[in-house]
Amino acid sequence: MFKVDLNSDLGESFGAYKMGMDEEILKFVSSVNVACGFHAGDPCVMDKTLNLAKQNGVCIGAHPSYPDLLGFGRRNMQISFEEAKNYALYQLGALFGFAKAKDMKIQHFKAHGALYNMAAIDENLALALCEAVASFDENIIFLGLSNSAMNEAAKKKGLKYANEVFADRAYNDDGTLVSRKLEGALIHDENLAIKRVIKMIKESKVTSINGKEIDLKADSICVHGDNVKALEFVKKIKENLEKEQIQICALENFI
C-alpha cells in the first residue's frame, strides 16, 4: 500500500490578526508546519496551535522563515551561512519550548516561503538549514521540495529527508515551483489537481507547465485550508486518496 503524509501550514495568525482555519484543517491532515514568529505567529498563537495539534493527534514541525513579518516571509533576503543557520536554530528553539512543555516532539522541519524556494536551488543555504537541524536534533525529518538542493544537503548532513509535492501548484521543467507571480502558477481545477496528486504518489511523475513529464517523489502533500473553498478541496483530496487505497499517515511512520 502507498503511504503519504498530508501537511499544512498553521499558526499563522499574529496578535489581533487571524489567518487560516486551523481548527478545521487539523481534522484532515497528518502533519502541521507551525509558524515560529519570523513571518507569522506569536507566543500565544504557537501555544494554541500546539494544543490543537495535540488534541487532534497531529504531528508538528517547525516552519521557519526569513525575518519578514511585513512581507509574510515571501520576500527574498541576502543572508550569510551563519545567519541562515542561526535564524533556523532560533525558531526551532521557540517551538521546542512549547513542545517540551506539552510533552510533544518536533517531527519535522520545513522552511517557509522565500526561504524554502531559495533553499531549493541554493545548496549553501540548504546546508545552513540542515546544519541547524542536525545540531539541534538529528532525528528531526527535513521536509523539502522533491529532487531539490535541500535533498542533497540533507544527505550530506545525515538527516532523514521527506520529499514534498504541492497539490495546487504548477511545476517548471526543472522540478521547481512556478512563481506565484506568473499566470498558471496555481491550479484551480480541483479534479485536475487531485489526478496530479495521485499520479505523483503512484507513478512518481508530474507534468510540468510546459507539458514535460518530470520525475519526483511524493512523501508529503502540502495542502492549504485558509478559506472555506480550500478546506473543501482538502476534504476531496483525502476522500480520493482513501478511494485509491493510499494510506494517509504522519512522516514518522514511514520516513
Swiss-Prot record:
InterPro entries (alphabetical): Glyco_hydro/deAcase_b/a-brl, LamB/YcsF/PxpA-like
Q: Which domain of life is it from?
A: Bacteria
Listed A to Z, the keywords are: ATP-binding, Hydrolase, Nucleotide-binding
**EC number(s) stated in the UniProt entry for this protein:** 3.5.2.9
Cell membrane in keyword set: no
One BP term from GO: carbohydrate metabolic process
Q: Tell me the first and last residues of the signal peptide.
A: none
A molecular function annotated in GO for this UniProt entry is: 5-oxoprolinase (ATP-hydrolyzing) activity
Q: Which family does it belong to?
A: Belongs to the LamB/PxpA family.
> What does this protein do, in the record's words?
Catalyzes the cleavage of 5-oxoproline to form L-glutamate coupled to the hydrolysis of ATP to ADP and inorganic phosphate.
**Subunit (UniProt):** Forms a complex composed of PxpA, PxpB and PxpC.
Q: What is this protein called?
A: 5-oxoprolinase subunit A
Q: Which organism is this protein's natural source?
A: Campylobacter jejuni subsp. doylei (strain ATCC BAA-1458 / RM4099 / 269.97)
Organism taxonomic ancestry: Bacteria, Pseudomonadati, Campylobacterota, Epsilonproteobacteria, Campylobacterales
